[in-house]
Amino acid sequence: MSSWITGLADKAENILNKLDQNAATALQTENATGSADPMRRSMTSSTQSLSTSLKSTLSPVRRSGANSSSSVKSDGGVSVVTKDMRQKMTTSASFSNSPDISANSMDTNELAAFKIALNEITAERDELRLRLEDLNNETEKFDLHQHTQVLEALVKSLSEERDKAVHDYNEAQAANMAYVHSISELETNLAKLQQEYISAAHKLQMQTKETEQQRQELQEYRIKAQRALQAKDSLIAELKAKPTEEGADPNLVSKDSETRFLQIEHESLKQELEHANEELQKARLQLDDYVSQERQRQVELSSARQREETLAKELRQAREHSVTSESDQRVLTQELASLRQQLSNQMAAAATRLQEREQQLQQMRQRLSEEANTGAKSDYETRLKALTQSLVERQSLLERVTSERNALRLQHEKAQTQLQQNMHLVEMESQRGSSRHTMLNSTDDVKAQFPLLMHPSPFDNRVARRFKRALRQADSMGIRVGTFLRRYPMMRVSVIVYVALLHLWVMFVLLSTTPN
C-alpha cells in the first residue's frame, strides 16, 4: 500500500513539474495566440494523465483499505487530497478551455493565478508526503507489534515445550527407577524359584528311585510267595486226593496237622499279599502325585523363564535409554564447552576494545588539557562525549556478556549434575541393587547484578574510583559467598548454627557478668 501511495506522489510530482515547465514556456513566448493552444493542450493532457493516474492508483488503495484501520485512514486522506487536486485541475482546465477566453486576452494576471494554483498544489503535495511518512511509520510500528506478538507466542510455546520435556524426563526417570527395583525383585524371586525347582527335582529323583526299588522288592516277594503258594497248593491237593482212613498211623495224623498248619500259613501269606498289593497301590498313587507336581513345577519354571525373558528385554531397553541419555549429555557438554570458548573470546575482545577506548579517552583528555582554544575544546568535548557514550555502551555489553557467562556457567553445573545422576543410575543398573544417592542443589540461579552507582565514569576522581572498586570487590565477594551457601546446604546450616550459638554465648555473657 505504501508503494502505491509513493507511486501516486511521484506521478503527481511529475505532472506538476510538467505544468511548471508549460507555464514557463508560456510566459517566455511573446505571441499569445501561438502559446495559448499548446498551453491548453498541455494542461488538458496533464489533467487527463493526473486523473487517470489517480484512478489507477486509488483503486488498489481502496481495495486494500478493508484490511487495516491505518490503511483506511490513509485512503481517506489521499481521497480528500485527490478530490481537491481534481477540482483545482478541472478549474484550471476549464479556465484554459473556456471559449470566452481567447489568445489575445490572456495576460499576466491569469498567469499569476495559475502560479498560485501551482503553489497550492505543491503545498498539498508536501502535505501528502508528510501523511505518507506518517503512514509508513504507523505501518512499521504495526509490523513491529505483530512481530513482537509472534515472538512472544513463540517464546511461550517454547517454554511450554521445555516444561513438558522436563516433566516427561522426570517421569521417565521415575519409571526407570521403578523398573530397576522390579527387575531386582524379580531376579531374586527367579533365583529362589530355581533353587526350589532344583531341590524338588532332586527329591523327585530320590523318590522315584525308592519307588522303583520297592517295586522290584515287591515283585520278587510276590514271585516267591506265588511259588510257595503253588507248592503248598499242590501239596494240599495231593493230601486231599489221598484221604486218611480210620485207625491210620500217627505219621498220617502228623501230616494232617502239617497240612492244617500249611493252610494257616497260606491264609497268612494271602493276607500279606493283599497288604503288599495295597501298599503298591498307595505307592502308585504317590508316584502319580509326584508326577503331577513335577508337571506343575515345569509349568511354573516355563512361566518364570518367560518372565525372565521379558525382564531381560526391559533391562536392555533401560540400558539403551541410559546410553542414549549419556550420548545426549556428552553432546550438551561439548556444546557448552564451545559456547564457553566463544564467550571467553568475546570477553577478551571486548576487554581489549575497552582498553583501547580508555587509552583513546586518556589521550583525548591530555590533548584537551594541553590545548586552550575554545573551538578546539568544544570539538574535543563532543568527541569526549561520543567516546564516553561508546565506553558506556561497551561497559553495558561487557555486563551483558558477564551475565550470559554466569547463565552458561549455571547451565554447565546443571548438566554436570544430570550427568552424575545418569552415571549413578547406570551403576545401580549394573550392580542390580537399590542404593541411595544424594543430589546436588541445582537451584543456583544467582546472577551478578551491578548497581548503577558502581559504574565507573570518566569524570570520577581517584578516591571515587578506589571506592567504587572496593564496592565492586565487596559485591563480588558477597555474590560468591551467597552462591557457595546456596550450592552447599550443609555449610548454610552450619553457618546458621554458628551464628545462633554465638548469639546465645553473647547473651549468656551479658546476663551472667555483673558490673564492679
From Swiss-Prot:
What does the record list as coiled-coil region(s)?
Answer: 108-423
Presence of keyword Membrane: yes
Name the GO cellular-component terms. Answer: cis-Golgi network membrane; Golgi apparatus; Golgi cisterna; Golgi membrane
Q: Where is the composition biased (Low complexity)?
A: 42-80
What InterPro entries does the annotation carry? Golgin_subfamily_A_member_5
- Residue ranges of the region described as Disordered: 28-80
Cytoplasmic side of the membrane: what ranges? 1-492
Localization, UniProt: Golgi apparatus membrane
> Which ranges does the record list as Lumenal topological domains?
514-516
- How does the protein associate with the membrane? Single-pass type IV membrane protein
Kindly name one Pfam family recorded for this protein. Answer: Golgin_A5
PANTHER family assigned: GOLGIN SUBFAMILY A MEMBER 5 (PTHR13815:SF7), GOLGIN-84 (PTHR13815)
Q: What does this protein do?
A: May be involved in maintaining Golgi structure and in intra-Golgi transport.
For this entry, the protein name equals Golgin-84
Upper lineage ranks? Eukaryota, Metazoa, Ecdysozoa, Arthropoda, Hexapoda
